Amino acid sequence: MTEHCDLAVVRRVPSSFFEALRMDEPEHAIDVAKAKEQHDRYVQTLKGILPTVLEVAADEACPDCMFIEDTAVVIGATAVITQPGAPSRRPETRPVRDVLSGLGLTIVDMSAVNPDALTDGGDVLFTGRELFVGLSKRTNAAGLEVLKSTFEVLGVPVYGVSVIEGLHLKSVVTFADTDVLVVANNRSVAGDCPSQKLPPM
């Protein structure tokens, strides 16, 4: 099973971005103007390679809203609207739900399936065949179970992975190519994973 992407949904950087959640206090304050400029270039790049890019307006009441991947997990014609682990981020989901519903996708509201389920999309990695879900500070076992019950009936295996360090699974793992995951060389992710250490580039 492979997924061909021809559409992206993005969300603009709010001017309140300097109030975004963080694990540690940064050495320097966020340069919001620069962040907006960089995000604009990112959006223009997407528009150069994809037929359709949908933009959701920023919400000044939601400083983290530009991290739109945390609000939904989409595979094929099915979208799970997540319940983000940080309560302050939960209002971000409604506008994203509206956009995805308008595309005709089947919508599954995680909070309606299980009010205790929590998931940030940053903990969800889809390889085109299977779904890896990080169990982290922001994603719990109940959230994993909602994803399993939604996507495994569609033929997508779903696996939970404990995230020991870092905020999200995709902070320490990324999908590089068919059958290749790049994993941080530390104890961030629990479990035995067949791997090959590559020399520094």
For each feature predicted by the language model, list its residue ranges:
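The feature marks the mature, well-folded catalytic cores of soluble enzymes
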Residues: M1-M201
